[in-house]
Amino acid sequence: MGNVNAREEANSNNASAVEDEDAEICSREAMSAASDGNHVAPPELMGQSPPHSPRATQSPLMFAPQVPVLPLQRPDEIHIPNPSWMQSPSSLYEEASNEQGIPTMITWCHGGKEIAVEGSWDNWKTRSRLQRSGKDFTIMKVLPSGVYEYRFIVDGQWRHAPELPLARDDAGNTFNILDLQDYVPEDIQSISGFEPPQSPENSYSNLLLGAEDYSKEPPVVPPHLQMTLLNLPAANPDIPSPLPRPQHVILNHLYMQKGKSGPSVVALGSTHRFLAKYVTVVLYKSLQR
């Protein structure tokens, strides 16, 4: 047993010595080739590597493989898309503010699945679809002041809202009427009573109301109904002057002229509106039978 171990140790020592000699020979040949300027290895060393040579060991993978990407662009070549839905709210508000008109809500509350509206505001060219809001359908339109005709299209059929102002044409078709006017107080004196009193607080009292406070009777008719077209004072009786625009509260009422008719004739008048025009019909009736 002792001889066998001695032989194995001797063989291993001889093998290591041979390997060291081979490594030294390779290093010497490489140094001589580098000094001579010849970088080509000998033919016997091209196909094999000596043991423990740096070419025999492979370096581990130190970095993960990179995914190819597009090269960066210069600032002047970068294109940024600008779709309509990415616009800022301020720009949308500026576009809406540039549109002049009166905001108007049009509502349909008589059922249906698909509701649209068309009108004379664009000469009946387009149909606008209403959006469902609970049980009703609504749409917001910004229109200039004026009188418009419009109608609803409910599930493909022409309809009109009976609770809204309406008119009929010569063919018997019914349309709704939309009257948009810039609000101006018609009777400036009527709003003076709502102004706060210009008096100091020390002048207020808590006295009880007297009998004279309850003796004043209310007017028989509203004051704006007394100035009808029949009772307007004429600037020049010989030259007929153009009539002013009638107030909307006197439309579709029957009025009697005061004191200008003869004792046997009475004048009755009524004013109607069609679009932006006003028509007043005066009927002179004899009191004699």
Swiss-Prot record:
Origin superkingdom: Eukaryota
GO process terms (BP): fatty acid biosynthetic process; nitrate assimilation
Kinase-interacting sequence (KIS) as annotated region, ranges: 103-180
Record note on modification: Sumoylated.
Keywords linked to the UniProt accession: ATP-binding, Carbohydrate metabolism, Cell membrane, Fatty acid biosynthesis, Fatty acid metabolism, Lipid biosynthesis, Lipid metabolism, Lipoprotein, Membrane, Myristate, Nitrate assimilation, Nucleotide-binding, Ubl conjugation
Function of the protein: Regulatory subunit of the probable trimeric SNF1-related protein kinase (SnRK) complex, which may play a role in a signal transduction cascade regulating gene expression and carbohydrate metabolism in higher plants. The SnRK complex may also be involved in the regulation of fatty acid synthesis by phosphorylation of acetyl-CoA carboxylase and in assimilation of nitrogen by phosphorylating nitrate reductase.
Subunit-level organization: Subunit of a probable heterotrimeric complex consisting of an alpha catalytic (KIN10 or KIN11) subunit, and a beta (KINB) and a gamma (KING or SNF4) non-catalytic regulatory subunits. Interacts with SNF4. Interacts with FLZ1, FLZ2, FLZ8, FLZ9, FLZ10, FLZ12, FLZ13 and FLZ14.
Protein name, per record: SNF1-related protein kinase regulatory subunit beta-2
Organism: Arabidopsis thaliana
Organism taxonomic ancestry: Eukaryota, Viridiplantae, Streptophyta, Embryophyta, Tracheophyta
